[in-house]
């Protein structure tokens, strides 16, 4: 669970920037997939 929380924290912080958020989402999606 700690890993999930650690992964979500940066996402919320970066999520403030739509452009960066999209890049992060695509990277995470590819990595998890």
UniProtKB/Swiss-Prot annotation:
Record-stated family: Belongs to the MSDIN fungal toxin family.
The miscellaneous comment for this protein is:
The typical symptoms of amatoxin poisoning are gastro-intestinal distress beginning 6-12 hours after ingestion, a remission phase lasting 12-24 hours, and progressive loss of liver function culminating in death within 3-5 days. One of the few effective treatments is liver transplantation.
Q: Where is this cross-link: 2'-cysteinyl-6'-hydroxytryptophan sulfoxide (Trp-Cys)?
A: 12-16
Residue ranges of the propeptide: 1-10, 19-33
Q: Where is the Cyclopeptide (Ile-Pro) crosslink found in the sequence? A: 11-18
Task: Tell me where in this chain the PTM (3R,4S)-4-hydroxyisoleucine is found.
Answer: 11
Tissue-wise, where is it found?
A: Expressed in basidiocarps.
Q: Name one Pfam family in it.
A: Amanitin
Q: Which GO terms describe its molecular function?
A: toxin activity
Task: Classify the source by domain of life.
Answer: Eukaryota
Post-translational note: Processed by the macrocyclase-peptidase enzyme POPB to yield a toxic cyclic octapeptide. POPB first removes 10 residues from the N-terminus. Conformational trapping of the remaining peptide forces the enzyme to release this intermediate rather than proceed to macrocyclization. The enzyme rebinds the remaining peptide in a different conformation and catalyzes macrocyclization of the N-terminal 8 residues.
InterPro entries the record matches: Amanitin/phalloidin
Originating species: Amanita exitialis
Note whether Transcription occurs among the keywords: no
Gene symbol here is: AMA
Protein name (database record):
Alpha-amanitin proprotein 2
Q: Give the protein's function.
A: Major toxin belonging to the bicyclic octapeptides amatoxins that acts by binding non-competitively to RNA polymerase II and greatly slowing the elongation of transcripts from target promoters.
Keyword Plastid listed: no
Which residue positions does 4-hydroxyproline occur at? 18
